Regions:
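Short active-site segment of divalent metal-dependent hydrolases/proteases
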Residues: 76-84
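Short secondary-structure boundary/capping segments within folded domains
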Residues: 33, 50-51, 101-106
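Intrinsically disordered, compositionally biased, charge-dense segments
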Residues: 1-41, 91
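Charged phosphate-binding loop/patch that engages nucleotide di/tri-phosphates or the phosphate backbone
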Residues: 20, 127, 131-133
Length: 133
């Protein structure tokens, strides 16, 4: 039954993606559900592709992306953060994420780009992308 649910969710996502203009909100909500999460989705402004806010379990996305691939990579990346926060608990996730950023900065690296949690989320997104494209 689990596979049937995933397949029907997959078909719905693919149908949405094939529309002339992708409904990012609906597609993101469907993806979040496929990973067993209840994270909220909202649109924001700014230069970031996306952001996960663990305190409110919210994924913030841009209103548009250069390609469907960029959109999917962003949503999947943020889903990984949400999965980690769910697995560890919000407070523990925030603590570990912040510590990793501090350690990167201490080593003269970027606290965001060189944060091991960001690297894990990017690997997860690349690994999962083929399921949705």
């Amino acid at each position: 039954e689990q596979n049937t649910l995933k397949e029907s969710g997959y078909k719905k996502i693919m149908k949405n993606i094939l529309l002339e203009r992708v409904d990012y909100m609906d597609s993101a909500k469907q993806l979040v559900k496929q990973y067993g999460l209840n994270s909220k989705i909202q649109f924001g402004s700014g230069k970031n592709f996306g952001e996960y806010i663990p305190e409110t379990d919210t994924i913030t996305l841009r209103k548009s992306y250069k390609s469907v691939k960029d959109f999917l990579m962003t949503v999947l990346h943020e889903i990984k953060h949400a999965l980690d926060a769910k697995r560890l608990g919000t407070k523990k996730f925030i603590k570990k994420y912040t510590q990793a950023g501090t350690m990167a900065q201490y080593d003269g690296l970027d606290p965001h780009d060189d944060n091991k949690w960001e690297e894990k989320a990017e690997r997860f997104a690349k690994q999962e992308l083929s399921k949705w494209m």
